[in-house]
Every structure is written in C-alpha cells, then in structure tokens.
Amino acid sequence: MALSISGAGAPWWTLPDLELRMTDLCVAYTGRMKAACLVLFLALCALVAEADVAPSSVSGPRPAALDEATAGRFAALALKCLHQEYPNHILHTLTSDADARTPRELTPAFYGCYDWHSDVHAHWLLVRLMRLFPDADFTPVARAAVAQSLTPQNIAGELAYLRRDDRAYFERPYGLAWLLQLCAELRAWDDPQAAQWSNVLKPLESEAATRLENWAGKLRYPIRVGEHDQTAAAFSLVWDWAGVADDPQMRSVLAYAARRFYLADRDCPLSYEPSGEDFYSLCLGEADFMRRVLGPDLFAHWLGGFLPDIPTNPGKPWLEPAIVSDRSDPKLAHTDGLNLSRAWMLEGIADGLPASDHRVAALRAAAQLHRDAALPAVTGEHYEGGHWLAAFAVYLTSGSGLK
C-alpha cells in the first residue's frame, strides 16, 4: 500500500510532523465532522498496520516458545484456584441486607481465584493453553473445569449481577477487557466445545463490549496508573478482541481515543517508574497500544518522540527489571506482574517497528531481562501472586497480542 496525499512527496504515514498532517486533513471541519475525520485518519493507520506489516523478521533473538511442561505448570496454578471461593476480595456495592451474599451466589461463573477479574483471566489461561496444547495431559481436566463454569445458568447469573443499576462500573476496564480476551480466545479456537462456550458467553460479551465502547467514547482523559484502571493496557486487550470479533466500530472508537489521548505525547518519564504497587508500566503500556493503532513507519516516528532514550546499541544498559521485596504481600507482589507485563510490552513494541529499526535489539534484550527475572517467581508459593501471575506468564510466553 502506498497511499499519499496530493502534493506531498512521501506516503502520509511517514511524514515527520504527524500533528501538522492531521491538521491539514481535518482543519476544515468542526464538531462531529472533525471527530469523524480524526477517526478516519486513525482507522487508515490501522489499515496500514494490517496491510503493510509482514511476518516479523526484526533483529534480535526471540524468546523460546512455550513448551508443554511449562504450560502444564501454569495450567495447574489456574486449576487450583478456578473454583476456590475463599479467600475472596469482592468489589461489591450493598444497597440492602439482601445484597450480603457469598461470591458464588453473586457471580456464579467467576467466583474463584481471590477476585472476579483474576478468575476471568484464569479461565482465559486455560482456554488458551487448551487451544495451544489440545493433547496435553492437563487438557481434559481443564475442559471439565471450564465447562463447570461456562453454563447458560451461570452466565445468566453473571449478566443479572452486572445489569443492576448500582453495578454499571463493575470491573471497568480491567476485568471487562480480560473477559473480552477470554471471548476472543474461544472465537479463535476451532473446537466444538469452545464454540459452545463462546455462544453461551455472547450475552456477557456483548454487555462488556457495549460498556467499554460507551466508556471509551465519553472518557475525557486517559487514566495513567500502573494498576487495574490503566486505559492503554485495557485498550490493547479490547483492540485485539475487536479484531477477532470483527468489530470495526470498537476499533474506530479506540483509534479516536488513541488520537485524543496519546498521539501528541512526548518524552514519557520512564525513569520515574515503577511506582511501588504497579503491575503495568504507564509508558510501555501506552506504546504497546499505539503500535496496534499505527503502522510500523508511523509508529517508529511516534516512538522516537515518546521514548527518545531507547538505545540503538543492544549492549547498552537501558531498563532494569523491578525488584520484588515481599511476595507474600498482595500489593508488593504486583512487581512480579510488572516485570511480566513489561516483557510482553517490550516485545510488542519491538514487533510493531519496521524490521530494519535499530532499536529492536535493545527492546528485545530488555524484554528478555524482564522475562528472566519474572518467570521463576510464578510458582504459586504465595496465593497473593499465585492466583493471578500465571495468566500474565501465559500472555507473555504464548505470544498473546503479537502478530
């Protein structure tokens, strides 16, 4: 694809001044027409990303693929907590005595693994590993466990819980985004039982997608935190779901959000990270989202302004893994998750650049450092991390979110 603007000497996605080019395109419009113009611009960026990106051949070593033995270890961690009701941390608004009920009664499909969102991504973990390793020893047990959860009755109970007026913001965006990841994994799996589960989940999937789309459309400012509320990390998960679910409207909404929130960002202070309880990086999370929306050349230019200190020399120290001080503390254990998510975000950023970009090797080297620091900690020794870290480990080691 070689789209160019009349009178311009270069394809529009390689022009150095992105904001000026967008002004050239959209300045004549106001109000809704200007918004539509900006949406179109970002949608075209997405088309370039899909059309121009060949299978990745960027420099720097790629990590080893997930093997069946390691997958079995991660599956065991998810199976251990999938239907373990207690201990449980519920985010639940009570309006009367009648609302004081057990987790199993409140959310009958996703009541284990300490909290709702962790149980959702434990289900995602099992579905992804079953899809990747259909003949593994853990697969029959995982099938039975997921089948116990994803029944029409249980999902009807989940939907009834969400649709109460006082729960309009439940698990937004983190838990709802991971629910869409679960739905995407089921959609992508060519398996009769997966198709059945996907069909059972469709009402809940539709509810989650509608809530996230409406929220992203009316959100005035991005949420720049290192925990559950971060918009960029959630948008990445939802963007990938929209591709599998063939939802161009969702992608248009997210592309417009990318333009409003992030396209003009410069000099992200990566040296200020991490905060003490982060499990997401603010800077890397944003870049990992933007590489999905922008084509490789446009993303390469944007990244140069956003993270200008990425070295072109892979031997130069750049980003060290964060240090975990106490894995028995549920908040301090977030740091293991930070190292895991940093690793997949760094790999994603490298994957989003042109094959010849000299920053790729340094990005991959930093990703490997974080991978090596984090994966040995995914043991389940402490339930504070054991109930959720395996999902992050599987997202990383199975290449989720990569081309």
Annotate each PLM feature:
Residues 12-13:
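Tryptophan (W) side chains
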Residues 37-46:
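Bacterial N-terminal signal peptides
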Residues 53, 58-111:
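Low-complexity, Ser/Thr/Pro/Gly-enriched N-terminal "stalk/linker" regions
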Residues 58-66, 76-80, 120-136, 177-193, ...:
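Well-ordered alpha-helical scaffold segments within catalytic/enzyme domains
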Residues 63-68, 103-120, 160-176, 218-231, ...:
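Solvent-exposed loop and edge beta-strand segments that line ligand/cofactor-binding
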Residues 105-108, 120, 129-242:
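Extended ligand-binding groove/face enriched in aromatic
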Residues 243-388:
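Long, repeat-rich segments with strong aromatic
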